[in-house]
Swiss-Prot record:
NCBIfam families, alphabetized: accD
Pathway given in the UniProt record: Lipid metabolism; malonyl-CoA biosynthesis; malonyl-CoA from acetyl-CoA: step 1/1
Protein name (record): Acetyl-coenzyme A carboxylase carboxyl transferase subunit beta
Transmembrane spans: none
Gene from which this protein is expressed: accD
Protein family: Belongs to the AccD/PCCB family.
Enzyme Commission number(s): 2.1.3.15
Cited InterPro entries: AcCoA_carboxyl_beta, Acetyl_CoA_COase_Trfase_b_su, ClpP/crotonase-like_dom_sf, COA_CT_N
Amino acid sequence: MNWLTNVVRPKIRNILRRETPENLWIKCPDSGHLVFYKDVEANQFVIPGSNYHMRMGAVARLKSVFDGETWYDIALPEVTADPLKFRDERRYVDRIKDARAKTGLHDAVKVGYGKLENFPVVIAVQDFDFMGGSLGMAAGEAIVRGMELALEKRAPFILFAASGGARMQEGILSLMQMPRTTVGVQMLREAKLPYIVVLTNPTTGGVTASYAMLGDVQLAEPGALIGFAGARVIEQTIREKLPEGFQRAEYLRDHGMVDIVVHRHDLRSTLARLCRILTKSPAAEIEVVTPEPEPVAEAAVVLPAEAVAPPPAAEAAAPPATPPA
């Protein structure tokens, strides 16, 4: 029996076993309910029911904004992969290789050029799945290149921020990207080109101390964590309890740090409207079809007999004129 139970039965189970995808279900962080992954993906990674906004990858984000889900990928300049030869538990170059294999991205920022409701725009997206969306030399170069393209095309520049801050493996070289991107923002401002920032969950650290909080209009997704230092660090520093909802998008909106909190489903139309307002462009022409009214049969009005007037006598026809002799 040992041979049957220990050898044969496991082999039969392996034959009959069906592999289940790891990402078949997603657990909502807000409600704790399990949701079918395809339903969440089809809903732009917003949990149906709870409306919790999950993190969204760079490619999926660009697809959700650009017309026809098409755009031109912007070639980004190469930078030194590991200038400091940094190593902690693992080598920095190995971490980059793993992040590239996981996300399919070259670095944490992806830049595209296309049309948003037929309006040309340049969009840069930070992907939190690539080493926490951290700001390094490659990410800084990508953002600056996107701003330069916006200047060249005379197009608005839109940035979706999602980051844990500066990339510590690059030291002062990553911190240098903060003033570089700030100079890029100033160039857009001098050219009178709109710079719109969408703060997503999370946006923290040195990113919030530079380009992420310098937009002409600051948008945020519902419930996004936005701040410089963590809440626990602040509480330990000031020795006070922070208010409820501190560093969330709604709290920042109520205290003047964010202009609008926009649901992800409304972001596309909101961004297009802002671009047209800030550039003083006419609204997109929408063909309005007015349905033809259906003819209504007139109801017959019955009058009393005494109110009905007799028809007028027919006038005698005039004799034809006699031509002159």
